[in-house]
């Protein structure tokens, strides 16, 4: 909605400044407008009210315009990034309207122009970004059977696309990438979960056209076709990429030289994990929103922020490309064997975030400290190359080459940039001494001013006889001679009064005025010269942007591999063996997170699955370790396929295409967020998508409904997974009846199902969980003991024991199972699987015998007989 001048006045009745403001605001009605006025960014009218509320800053008034007071709020320019970060975190977008040119030289109203739009997905400033998490902007396009995705990490200079063929796959990609801002065509009826996301921005549908997207990409990258990017035959990905690029150009309002290519990701290259699996495995965020005690929290010992971001990306996209993963394993092993990881790690401590610094160089927003950090990082390359040169690891040899030689750029920055430059270019002192003769001369003139002023003060005191006379300077009035009020009558006649204070008078002389003009001119010229030299440095570095980006990417990967080597040695992890044949054999496996946070020794357990043993039915008491066991094996598989060592004594892992989980309601990990419908929805997804190369975790299927319904569901799901999907399945259940599945045959052969259990023992009236997986089914549930441990009142537990004894006795007497007897005693729940009533049954229900005559009753009887 466009903001109109308040008070009902036309534009003609507003001041020139407010006319200028309303003209700028009319172009960006839905954004907050930061309107530069001197040392402040001001917001007016509705923007001011909104900003005052969101930022807790003062709402004031600035005179009036058109006869109406002007609501106003402002933030200082020197601290605006902190306020901007808070607004972006709240989902707001901001248009930055700057003063163009030198306000001091402007005749009349200074020119202003919107130079940039800052949105949640387009931030590049260091102060606004999360150091170890990508900030992504994404666009979506679709046809009936295809979704196109394009996303950009502007701060890191990455541009990627993908296509998926289902809404489930789209949801999985969104869960993996977690875009900060999402662009959707305005006319499409997108799923509800998409529309409710934070950061969704509707765009005109014609911007998502594949042909116009192709033309835009060709023009931007200066190409004749898109085959080099591998997207020539991907119209939906092209459409999304074109819409994304258009939005970036619209918001950034400048060249984007750091976006140099597009990467086409293929779903088949990676192990698929949907949103539920990522949530259940708590890769980097717990289900309660906390980031502590997650897999990433245990795994991440990277030194650099860019390494931390790459590790997070790897963790969310384990690869199916076994040769790529094996090369990572080999690189980690080579580092461990040669102690290379420790040597590299020490060097990495002095590395900066080159990836994001190079983006700011390309966008001309790099600050002096960015350039000095880049200088220091490039100066480390000779040492890093020396360390890597002796390695025989194929991957480390590739990374050695990718680092490149940047001696000339490093040497230039060493000569050109001061050792510890100021934060801002306008503070001066960024360019090192002896780099530029002209700058040195201007600085010398400015620096010699101090001695001149000391000499002048001494001479004037002696010639005037005024002991309190002193020479000073301030930014408003420039240089002055100050004399106290008591001696002001002694001021020489050639002194010209410049300023009157309460206790002193300030004067200027012709000599001091001439000196002031000379010095201030030298300072201004020195700053202008520094700015020119600084821009030249950015040009020089920018010309090497592509090889420098490859260098930063290599450093990031080295940091992650060093992290893997350090974790393997510190946590006693082993190198997994990736097999071509189908198997999942883990000896002495441990849960990486549980082991890291608990004080007691973690009890390791084995897992052995192969084509004739594809499912384990896991029974045992609650708290016995079933859920931990299932998750630890999924995490071990995931770690193996990102290139990490794993928490086990040995691990042989065959091809895996998906990791799928169904965690039941009531689990501590799920925090009671699941419902029976959600349980069935997630189970349905697994049954429809699991393959013979999938790893599936099923935890307590069926407990959200009645006992019979739940048991029937669990039985049917287990059979489907074992015989139809034929996937690797860990099936934890409290239904003891399912243990009989292992004894059945299927199509003349074994069922492929085996029983294992976790046990507990009672010792001194205490229940001790063994946390050790054993072959065979459990023989006790220990439900009442667990209830007592949970703190149920003793009287309640005692009553339960008596009731259990009664049920068991009645079961023995009637030769029916305890579960059947319990069901007979309980109120009956509607059967989920009851068949639909027959026509005869419906007709019978509709009869009202008391209202029928004998003849009508006979006719009804014949009709019923005909329906049978």
UniProtKB/Swiss-Prot annotation:
Keywords, in A-Z order: ATP-binding, DNA damage, DNA repair, DNA-binding, Nucleotide-binding
Classification via InterPro entries: DNA_mismatch_repair_MutS, DNA_mismatch_repair_MutS-lik_N, DNA_mismatch_repair_MutS/MSH, DNA_mismatch_repair_MutS_C, DNA_mismatch_repair_MutS_clamp, DNA_mismatch_repair_MutS_core, DNA_mismatch_repair_MutS_N, DNA_mismatch_repair_MutS_sf
Binding site residues for ATP: 620-627
This protein's record includes keyword ATP-binding: yes
Molecular function in Gene Ontology: ATP binding; ATP-dependent DNA damage sensor activity; damaged DNA binding; mismatched DNA binding
Database matches in PROSITE patterns: DNA_MISMATCH_REPAIR_2 (PS00486)
GO terms (BP aspect): mismatch repair
Keyword Kinase: no
One GO CC term on file: cytosol
One Pfam family recorded for the sequence: MutS_II
Domain of life of the source: Bacteria
Record-linked PANTHER family: DNA MISMATCH REPAIR PROTEIN MSH1, MITOCHONDRIAL, DNA MISMATCH REPAIR PROTEIN MUTS FAMILY MEMBER
Function: This protein is involved in the repair of mismatches in DNA. It is possible that it carries out the mismatch recognition step. This protein has a weak ATPase activity.
HAMAP family from the UniProt entry: MutS (MF_00096)
Family: Belongs to the DNA mismatch repair MutS family.
Name used for this protein in its record: DNA mismatch repair protein MutS
Organism annotation: Xylella fastidiosa (strain Temecula1 / ATCC 700964)
